[in-house]
């Protein structure tokens, strides 16, 4: 089977032709290499430089686009308006209507999409297929399958039909994907469809036949092989172990790191090979020339229970590469007290002469292995000048209890709100050694009266495990005060405490919704949804309150200054992120994510994007900053057909297909969150349909790879046209 990567990339460039008209960051063979982008070298799904001739937009067309942006931003499902624009003469209006229907995430939109299934425009029909998947329309399976299997279906349409089957996750759709992959012939036309079908079948949770996936693992095209490796890794089927072992020696590191990630200990032990057979493959991967492969080998080794693996992980705590060292620490911690032999080395790794990230990771692992052994290093790190060190110390000290009083007291006035909240939670919990609940409540009385939102948040959080119906008035009063705060942490913690009371005996939800018959804010709707589940919908309905300051003039400005210029072939806005590790340039995608692009540009213009810490760094996955502002309005996460490639710029919030968020509530599944900007270090197929492709890195992906926990965004500015 031979399909050239160039053919696959060219096909996907055509099907994603609505994206920003500039080239994406190259996928270098070795992560971190400063390799310039070459024609045809961009990762699949990346915006690709191309000239697209589009029909001009009339004044009335622009007005309709303005209307759609307003409906999306205000979460207003206006059926009549959507139906009218979905039947407009101009194909771009129909395409954008399909986008809006999907993003509004209202089941009524399925009927509008059904009426669009015969659209003559390929880009529109592809968007309809994509939107049908977003709305998880199980009644559309036969139609989507006809597109997938049809020999005359345009490539872009068939590709989106395959992608939709990765969101409508049923036994039937998995079988249809398997049949397609088993029967598809190799060639330039089928390559993009096969690529998407491999990712789609990998998103299915239930196991099934893997032969059709394995078939493409033998392709000469690396773009198909890594997708096959990813699908086999995600499948979790022990039967795939031999195939993953073979792929772990593939010439491409893109293939190898996904394959190595799939060789987990439990999975190997359930296979005919056994962990004794897979462990040598991991040890070989530790010597790989590519740090991504090494990192995944360390991560996977953490799932093995043998003494030899523990010894190897312990040695790797001293690795110079922080991806390797911190991943080793996490692996040791995941084994719990079975890692006691590593205690001395973990303690040593917390000492001040080590890099801060490994100190924090080692302390967290030490607490997981033997909590008492973490007391002394945590107390010392509580006085550290590094926020990363103090954050880790606060989290561990809060778990320790009475013996941690000294360390907790040193953090009660910390300059960081999150550290203070964690420390106060642990400190107030010291009173819980008393069996009498009245004594515990007295200990929190002063905290609830504090002017510091972190202290009040901690007061609620610290009593969540034992509070009962008699505490409901106190928590409701605390919530009323929290509504006046600029930060949201006290609102969230009081609702969580009330939700815990509700779970233990009931009464809290009724009292809360009686006092607040209307959701006080967009954020509170989300907190209550996660806490009280269906009772939130019963009380407040399915419509989250919308908090936006955008006026009609703003929507007009966004369309005229961001959408129309790029639609007409102009350059997209580019931003330069100056970080503590170097410079990263990104290009935005205002054609499909105009609201998000405008919001980021507004934050940049007013100087908000300065000295913003990277609070979450997962080696070979993501680099994510904390919120740029407190009490931000929830942003519309503009999910689009742009793929989540390596170097993708998104934010750490998501609309979420409903099955992704089972349990206690609709909060996460209904909308978005604050703009926690995130760089994707790897492609993230499992998140397709849940996160926006806001932009992508065009320069500095090696800098992204070097960012560590605690690094900062120093500043962000807009690049001038032509600026290098």
Question: Each PLM stretch: what is its role?
Answer:
Residues 452, 473-724:
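Cyclophilin-like peptidyl-prolyl cis-trans isomerases
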């Amino acid at each position: 089977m031979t399909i050239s990567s160039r053919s696959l990339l060219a096909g996907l460039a055509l099907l994603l032709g609505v994206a920003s008209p500039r080239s994406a960051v190259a996928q270098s063979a070795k992560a971190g290499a400063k390799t310039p982008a070459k024609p045809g070298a961009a990762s699949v799904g990346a915006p690709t430089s191309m000239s697209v001739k589009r029909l001009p937009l009339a004044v009335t067309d622009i007005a309709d686009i303005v209307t759609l942006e307003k409906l999306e931003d205000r979460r207003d499902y206006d059926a009549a308006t959507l139906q009218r624009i979905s039947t407009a003469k101009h194909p771009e209006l129909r395409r954008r209507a399909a986008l809006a229907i999907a993003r509004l995430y209202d089941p009524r939109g399925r009927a509008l999409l059904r009426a669009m299934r015969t659209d003559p425009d390929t880009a529109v029909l592809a968007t309809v297929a994509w939107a049908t998947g977003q709305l998880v329309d199980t009644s559309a399976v036969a139609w989507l399958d006809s597109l997938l299997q049809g020999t005359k279906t345009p490539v872009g349409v068939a590709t989106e039909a395959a992608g939709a089957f990765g969101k409508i996750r049923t036994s039937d759709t998995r079988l249809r994907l398997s049949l397609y992959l088993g029967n598809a012939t190799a060639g330039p036309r089928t390559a993009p469809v096969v690529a998407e079908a491999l990712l789609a079948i990998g998103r299915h949770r239930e196991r099934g036949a893997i032969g059709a996936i394995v078939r493409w693992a033998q392709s000469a095209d690396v773009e198909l092989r890594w997708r096959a490796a990813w699908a086999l890794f995600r499948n979790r089927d022990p039967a795939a172990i031999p195939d993953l072992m073979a792929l772990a020696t593939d010439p491409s590191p893109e293939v190898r790191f996904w394959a190595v990630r799939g060789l987990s200990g439990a999975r190997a032990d359930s296979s005919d090979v056994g962990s004794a057979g897979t462990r040598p493959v991991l040890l070989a991967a530790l010597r790989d020339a590519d740090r991504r492969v090494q990192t995944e080998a360390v991560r996977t080794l953490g799932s093995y229970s043998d003494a030899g693996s523990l010894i190897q992980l312990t040695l790797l705590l001293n690795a110079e590469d922080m991806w390797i060292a911190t991943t080793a620490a996490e692996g040791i911690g995941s084994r719990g007290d079975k890692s006691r032999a590593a205690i001395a080395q973990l303690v040593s790794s917390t000492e001040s002469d080590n890099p801060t990230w490994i100190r924090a990771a080692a302390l967290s692992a030490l607490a997981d292995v033997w909590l008492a052994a973490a007391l002394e290093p945590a107390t010392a790190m509580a006085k550290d000048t590094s926020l990363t060190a103090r954050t880790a110390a606060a989290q561990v000290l809060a778990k320790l209890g009475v013996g941690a009083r000294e360390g907790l007291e040193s953090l009660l006035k910390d300059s960081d709100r999150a550290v203070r909240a964690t420390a106060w939670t642990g400190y107030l919990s010291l009173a819980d050694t008393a069996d009498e609940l009245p004594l515990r409540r007295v200990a929190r009385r002063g905290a609830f009266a504090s002017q510091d939102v972190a202290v009040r948040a901690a007061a609620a959080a610290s009593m969540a495990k034992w509070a009962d119906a008699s505490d409901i008035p106190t928590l409701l009063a605390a919530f009323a005060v929290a509504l006046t705060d600029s930060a949201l942490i006290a609102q969230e913690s009081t609702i969580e405490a009330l939700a815990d009371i509700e779970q233990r005996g009931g009464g809290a939800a009724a009292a809360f919704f009686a006092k607040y018959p209307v959701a006080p804010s967009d954020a509170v709707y989300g907190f209550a949804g996660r806490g009280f589940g269906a009772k939130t919908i019963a009380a407040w309905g399915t419509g989250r309150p919308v908090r936006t300051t955008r006026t009609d003039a703003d929507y007009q400005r966004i369309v005229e200054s961001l959408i129309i210029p790029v639609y007409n072939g102009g350059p997209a806005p580019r931003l330069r992120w100056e970080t503590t590790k170097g410079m990263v340039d990104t290009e935005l995608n205002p054609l499909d994510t105009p609201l998000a692009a405008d919001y980021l540009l507004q934050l940049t213009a007013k100087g908000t994007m300065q000295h913003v810490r990277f609070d979450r760094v997962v080696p070979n996955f993501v680099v994510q900053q904390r919120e740029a502002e407190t009490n931000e309005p929830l942003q519309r996460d503009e999910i689009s057909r742009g793929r989540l490639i390596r170097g993708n710029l998104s934010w750490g919030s998501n609309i979420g297909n409903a099955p992704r968020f089972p349990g206690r509530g609709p909060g996460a599944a209904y909308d978005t969150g604050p703009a926690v900007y995130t760089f994707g270090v790897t492609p993230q197929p499992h998140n397709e349909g849940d996160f926006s492709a806001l932009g992508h890195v065009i320069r500095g992906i090696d800098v992204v790879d070097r960012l560590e926990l605690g690094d900062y965004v120093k500043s962000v500015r807009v690049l001038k046209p032509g600026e290098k």
